[in-house]
Design a protein with these regions (language model features):
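Mid-to-C-terminal alpha-helical segments outside catalytic/metal-binding sites
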Residues: 1-12, 16-58, 85-93, 114-118, ...
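Active-site gating loops and adjacent loop-to-helix segments of metal-dependent hydrolytic enzymes
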Residues: 6, 15-41, 71, 167-194, ...
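Hydrophobic faces of well-ordered beta-strands that scaffold small-molecule active sites
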Residues: 10-14, 59-61, 99-102, 128-130, ...
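Active-site environment of divalent metal-dependent phosphoester hydrolases
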Residues: 17-20, 67-69, 107-111, 136, ...
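Short, conserved clusters of charged catalytic residues that mark active-site
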Residues: 42-46, 143, 147, 200-203, ...
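Active-site gating/metal-coordination segments in enzymes
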Residues: 57, 62-199, 206
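Glycine-enriched alpha-helix->loop->beta-strand junction motifs that scaffold or abut catalytic
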Residues: 123-126, 153-158, 212-214, 251-256, ...
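Aromatic-lined glycan-binding groove of carbohydrate-active enzymes
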Residues: 204-250
């Protein structure tokens, strides 16, 4: 590799589609990923060749949104189990190059807890990824989902909160006027950020981190705007009339953020200033974002070799035990 004299490069938010999951996608969810259809289903030679060409040693794979979050409590667990078994087979075909985050059918929290245990202890998954609202309705801070966080803490694995499209009422009021002309406005252009930033703030306010003090959460896209807004959020939540919460302390102690789909020098520098370089991990968001610009950006970004190494592989090696 050319980056940092051949040091390891691990990209941890890299997506694929399993047709046994995507066949359940409906409506707006069914339109996600259409422009990269061939690449997102390629989990073999083409993907590895692209990694080789761009200097990426390892991808941590996760199913693309909305994954299993839209599935019901009855059918969802079997779909998630089959998807994780399939992902295990994908990773075993290239065990030095591919790892995985488990899919969980959160509509059935007990089954999700059991599947997280199985996926980590039997299949070697590095944690789990949860995509947006369960059933299009429920944020992940709802207490029925807390057993998932309890088990993640016990297993010492992170939960990656990935965006999903917002609640339909939010779409109707805030977004629908422009999503026909600009479908990206619904997802990565704003809707995704709105949804996941809200979910993350709610998680802090819920008290889940007091209950599970070693719980670890990952956010993509340089923290979904929250590092930029952290000072103001912390101020607002501690003004007279609020119960008060140590938002900044909780966020910087429990959350990790990745560079997925966000290769901006100023944004990265702000995140380092707010969170410290030890909580930032490299990711690309392949294939929604091409592989090529990510490593090239890291070669030129104004960081010393030690900090680049932390972002590119050391932080992921520590957090995901790679």
């Amino acid at each position: 590799m050319t980056i940092l004299d051949g040091q390891r490069v691990i990209a941890i938010e890299e997506h694929y589609y399993d047709d046994q999951v995507t066949k359940h996608f409906q409506g707006l969810d069914g339109k996600l990923g259409g422009f990269i259809k061939d690449k997102i289903v390629d989990v073999g030679e083409g993907r590895i060749a692209s990694m080789d060409e761009c200097g990426i040693d390892v991808q941590v794979l996760s199913h693309g949104a909305p994954s299993t979050q839209k599935l019901d409590a009855e059918s969802g667990p079997a779909v998630a189990t089959a998807a994780n078994d399939h992902l295990y087979q994908i990773c075993q075909a290239n065990p030095d190059r591919l790892a995985g985050f488990a899919a969980l059918a959160t509509a059935n929290p007990k089954a999700a807890v059991d599947e997280l245990e199985r996926a980590v202890t039997k299949l070697g998954m590095k944690g789990a990824m949860i995509h947006g609202l369960t059933g299009g309705e429920l944020f992940i801070d709802d207490q029925q989902f807390w057993p998932i966080f309890e088990r993640a803490e016990a297993l010492d694995v992170p939960i990656y909160l990935h965006p999903g499209i917002p609640h339909q009422k939010v779409i109707d009021v805030y977004l629908k006027d422009y999503i026909k002309q600009y479908p990206g406005f619904l997802n990565a252009g704003w809707g995704f950020t709105m949804e996941t930033a809200t979910a993350s703030i709610r998680l802090v306010l819920s008290g889940v981190f007091e209950k599970y003090p070693n719980l670890k959460i990952i956010l993509g896209h340089l923290g979904e705007t929250l590092p930029f807004l952290m000072w103001r959020i912390d101020l607002a939540l501690n003004r007279p009339g609020n119960d008060g919460v140590a938002f900044r302390d909780i966020f910087t102690s429990h959350f990790y953020i990745t560079t997925s789909g966000f290769f901006s020098d100023p944004a990265l520098m702000l995140c380092i200033q707010e969170m410290g370089v030890d909580r930032i991990l490299f990711a690309i968001d392949y294939p929604f974002v091409p592989n090529e610009p990510g490593p090239k950006w890291m070669e030129t970004v104004m960081l010393n070799a030690e900090d680049k190494a932390k972002i590119l592989h050391r932080n992921s090696e520590r957090l995901l035990r790679m």
